[in-house]
Structures are given as C-alpha cells and as structure tokens.
Amino acid sequence: MTVRPFTLSRRALVLAASLAIAPLTQAADAPRVLFKTSAGDFTIEVYPDKAPKTVENFLQYVRDKHYDGTIFHRVIPTFMVQGGGFDQNYQQKPTRAAIEHEGRAALAKGGLRNVVGTVAMARTNAPNSATSQFFINVADNAFLDPVPIPDGDPVAKFEYQGRVHENVPRAQLLAAPQLYGYTVFGKVVAGMDVVQKIKAVPTGPGGPFPTDAPQTPILIQSATLVK
C-alpha cells in the first residue's frame, strides 16, 4: 500500500504557492534528529509536548534505523518533499502498526501548522493510518491543517470550502476524514537549504509513482538522534 500525504488534484497543489523561508526558532529541550542525505545534511526538531504519540513513533523508527537507506520518493516543488518508506529499489519497507492521528490535539496545545519548513506525518485517506512516512512542507499548505470544529451539538453553523452547513451533529464533523488534516510534529532547524535543493531536483516516473519521483535518487544515508 502506498502511503501518500494527500489526495488532491494538481490544480489544488498549484494553489499552495512557495513562500520565502522565515528564520525558525528553536526549543531548548526538544529532541533533534540529524538526517544525512546524498543532497546534504539537515536537522529537524520534534515536539513531544504537542504530539507525543507521533513523536515517539517517529523517534522509534529513527532508533531502529528504519530511515537509513530510504529515499525521498515524492517531490513536488510547490508543495512538499516526502520520504521514509521506500528503499532505492522502490521496495516499501515493513512498518509497525499505524498510530492515532494527533493533529487537532497538537493544534489545541499550540502546535505548529503546515507551513514552510515544518514536518508532518504522511498517511492514506484514513486519518489513523500514519506509520513511518513523513513529509517536509516547502510551501505554506494551510489546506493540510486540521479543521477546527466549533462548539455546540449540533453545531449551529459550520463553513467549509465556501459552503455553509447548519445544525450538523458534532460527532459527524469530528469523524469526517477530510477535516482531520495532517499532524505536524516538528520542523527543520538547520539545513533548510538542503531541503530546498531536494525540492528542485528533476522528477518523473519512478517505482509505483507515475510522476514526482526524483530522477536522481535522493538517499537518506542515516537518521540519528543527536539530542
């Protein structure tokens, strides 16, 4: 099964225009992971106080050396770069069980949104399906953020994608897959220039992907917990 972070049309992707990268602040006690790749090195910082299950899942894959020898298999320069699931032969690596989606809970705790430089879990259309794959936002992708559900039951008024819905059962909104968004659990704090280099590589067919696969493989040589 191919794990992708979205099921959006190419037209929708174009709407996520690439923006200038602002300096990223760093948290003193947050764990950091150094990725050494064939394009250079970058470091991400992760936030267990915002998305504890997601971060622990990711760090366990790091400790298990799951990411070593995998590739960035999907690159869309106006959107994101995705990796963590396939080796150089486009064989999908075995994973542990999928984890619970923490997007809404993370935002409620002041977590990050899907903006340039942040790192989120990839998944299928099922909200609770993330395993090892992750993506780095290379544009501000607000449409990937969890949609907040207003108070009340039923919800008196709910607006989504230009349509207004009235008196909707709260449970129905909370369960709607399209409102879950994608869980952001970290951000790039060093080496964003390397991520920019990755997003600029020529892409085309590769493995199970008809488009968006780097034509020169971008290999993750190692991912190491450095803090």
Q: Where are the regions a protein language model picked out?
A:
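Cyclophilin-like peptidyl-prolyl cis-trans isomerases
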Residues: 2-6, 24-227
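N-terminal export leaders
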Residues: 8-14, 19
